[in-house]
UniProtKB/Swiss-Prot annotation:
Oligomeric and partner information: Disulfide-linked heterodimer with TRAV27*01J42*01C*01 alpha chain. The TR primarily interacts via its CDR3-beta domain with M/matrix protein 1-derived peptide (GILGFVFTL) displayed by HLA-A*02.01 in a 'peg-notch' recognition mode. The alpha-beta TR associates with the transmembrane signaling CD3 coreceptor proteins to form the TR-CD3 (TCR).
Tissue-specific expression: Expressed in M/matrix protein 1-specific effector memory CD8-positive T cells readily detectable in the peripheral blood, secondary lymphoid organs and lung (primary site of infection) of IAV infected individuals.
Organism in which the protein naturally occurs: Homo sapiens (Human)
GO BP of this protein: adaptive immune response; T cell activation involved in immune response
Region: CDR2, residue numbers: 68-73
Region (Connecting peptide): 262-276
Record note on domains: The complementarity-determining region CDR1 confers specificity to the peptide antigen. Assumes a loop structure that recognizes the peptide-HLA-A*02-B2M complex. The complementarity-determining region CDR2 confers specificity to the peptide antigen. Assumes a loop structure that recognizes the peptide-HLA-A*02-B2M complex.
Gene name as annotated: TRB
Residues noted as binding a peptide antigen in the record, renumbered to the chain: D49
Cytoplasmic side of membrane: 300-310
Residues of the Ig-like C1-type domain: 140-249
Name listed for the protein in its UniProt record: M1-specific T cell receptor beta chain
Region annotation T cell receptor beta constant 2: where it falls in the sequence: 133-310
């Protein structure tokens, strides 16, 4: 590798930038069966001459796969075996994983710079998992656990816990929604999913997240809390022969309603709303019937008066 490229790698590891909209990669998550070819796209609109592809494995630093300094020219990096690239246009530098080998989830990053000796700008990355059998894919099971009374009484705070378990691969995004709107304040999510059985390569994963609100907010039974997990699984084109539902890309959610401390729960609140609605409909029906009866009596009186005058 040239000294210029080595310099760029050092700059990258010490602190490179990301540019919103400047460099795009797709897809964000990808899952493939062992032996298949996989192409990852990278586009940049920064008018940069140099472009790069890196791979990061769990617990390791970035490793250079390929780099290109001009159109129709590219050079191998440290781990070019099993990969191919092309640079037909200045703004595009696709990477193909040829005959993908089984491996834990790897993170692929595309970068660009004005020239090879300049600071590099990175895209958002692509997470790729390769497995020997698609039957290993499972969507998550999601549950929400309500706050403890001890926490509420001692701290006047309420922490809801969301637990997503039993999913593979670890291609998930977790979010909290309160009364139909996504929230970020008070949210603390694990940095990354953890293996349920660390010794197994194809172990399923789990992920937890916490949402902390005031006790008063939790004790309002009109407040609705939802934990949403976006799972990136198989596509519609992937072959599936198992006797369970195909684990396609999907959203899995769990929810909870605020719970008052005076016996007024979300269930009783909803039941009260239903009862009030029914009572309103009954009263409205009675009022309508009464109006019809009064109108009929008035009409009869008018007819009778007309007959008496005749």
């Amino acid at each position: 590798m040239s000294n210029q490229v080595l310099c760029c790698v050092v700059l990258c590891l010490l602190g490179a930038n990301t540019v919103d909209g400047g460099i795009t990669q797709s897809p964000k998550y990808l899952f493939r069966k062992e032996g298949q070819n996989v192409t990852l796209s990278c586009e940049q609109n920064l008018n940069h001459d140099a472009m790069y592809w890196y791979r990061q494995d769990p617990g390791q630093g970035l490793r250079l796969i390929y780099y290109s300094q001009i159109v129709n020219d590219f050079q191998k990096g440290d781990i070019a075996e099993g990969y191919s690239v092309s640079r037909e246009k200045k703004e595009s530098f696709p990477l193909t994983v040829t005959s993908a080998q089984k491996n834990p989830t790897a993170f692929y990053l595309c970068a660009s710079s004005i020239r090879s000796s300049y600071e590099q700008y990175f895209g958002p990355g692509t997470r790729l998992t390769v497995t020997e059998d698609l039957k290993n894919v499972f969507p998550p099971k999601v549950a929400v656990f309500e706050p403890s009374e001890a926490e509420i009484s001692h701290t006047q705070k309420a922490t809801l816990v969301c637990l997503a378990t039993g999913f593979y691969p670890d291609h998930v995004e977790l979010s909290w929604w309160v009364n139909g709107k996504e929230v970020h304040s008070g949210v603390s999510t694990d940095p990354q999913p953890l293996k349920e059985q660390p010794a197994l390569n194809d172990s399923r994963y789990c992920l937890s997240s916490r949402l902390r609100v005031s006790a008063t907010f939790w004790q309002n039974p009109r407040n609705h809390f939802r934990c949403q997990v976006q799972f990136y699984g198989l596509s519609e084109n992937d072959e599936w022969t198992q006797d369970r539902a195909k684990p396609v890309t999907q959203i899995v959610s769990a929810e909870a309603w605020g719970r008052a401390d005076c016996g007024f729960t979300s269930e009783s609140y909803q039941q009260g709303v239903l009862s009030a609605t029914i009572l309103y409909e009954i009263l409205l029906g009675k009022a309508t019937l009464y109006a019809v009866l009064v109108s009929a009596l008035v009409l009869m009186a008018m007819v009778k008066r007309k007959d008496s005058r005749g």
